[in-house]
């Protein structure tokens, strides 16, 4: 269904199935029927450990309510996500510092989540989601709890991450951001009702 170098938005009211669809794509939830393919290969949901590693390598996830670790700094929150796959702490820290610069938060590296604004926390979440250079970025209402100006900044960062080797899928109930995607899927009652390219 999805082509790389594209941003896909999934739009629909609360309860329409947007988050459920993202949870299925991210392998957090198991489908009750049908299958999920990645690069034209089906995912085997009987191999949970293998899927956890696959998700960590291939999929970056950004949530509406950031789930940053409260007792760790912004820098630590980012590089710890890399250590789940690699044991090279120095390399992880170097990558995390680069990503903080990318999201314009170098001056917040040693700040804890409680010291960050909502927009800053979301930018840390984006940096953490991409530290393993995933092929797919899933964002569940990434701008939902932000004021409009901050939301536009966060959305621009997502647009800047689009590349020939990566696709971005985000769920939203905000028509303004949904219309800025390359492809819009509208959901109602758990089904895709309309696709606008």
Where would I find each of the regions flagged by the language model?
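ABC ATPase NBD coupling module
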Residues: 43-60, 163
């Amino acid at each position: 269904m999805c082509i790389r170098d594209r941003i896909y938005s999934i739009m629909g009211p609360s309860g329409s199935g947007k988050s459920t669809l993202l949870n299925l794509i991210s392998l957090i939830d198991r489908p009750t029927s049908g299958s999920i393919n990645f690069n034209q290969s089906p995912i085997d949901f009987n191999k949970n450990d293998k899927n956890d590693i696959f998700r960590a390598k291939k999929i970056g996830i950004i949530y509406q309510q950031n789930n940053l670790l409260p007792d760790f700094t912004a820098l630590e929150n980012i590089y710890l996500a890399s250590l789940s796959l690699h044991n090279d702490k120095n390399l992880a820290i170097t990558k995390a510092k680069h990503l903080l610069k990318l999201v314009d938060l170098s001056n917040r590296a040693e700040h804890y989540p409680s010291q960050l604004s909502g927009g800053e926390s979301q930018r840390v979440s984006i940096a953490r989601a991409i530290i393993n250079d995933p092929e797919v970025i899933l964002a569940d209402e990434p701008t939902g709890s932000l004021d409009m100006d901050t939301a536009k900044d966060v959305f621009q960062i997502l647009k800047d991450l689009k590349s020939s080797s990566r696709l971005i899928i985000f769920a939203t109930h905000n028509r303004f951001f949904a219309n800025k995607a390359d492809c819009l899927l509208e959901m109602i009652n758990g089904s895709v009702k309309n696709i606008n390219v």
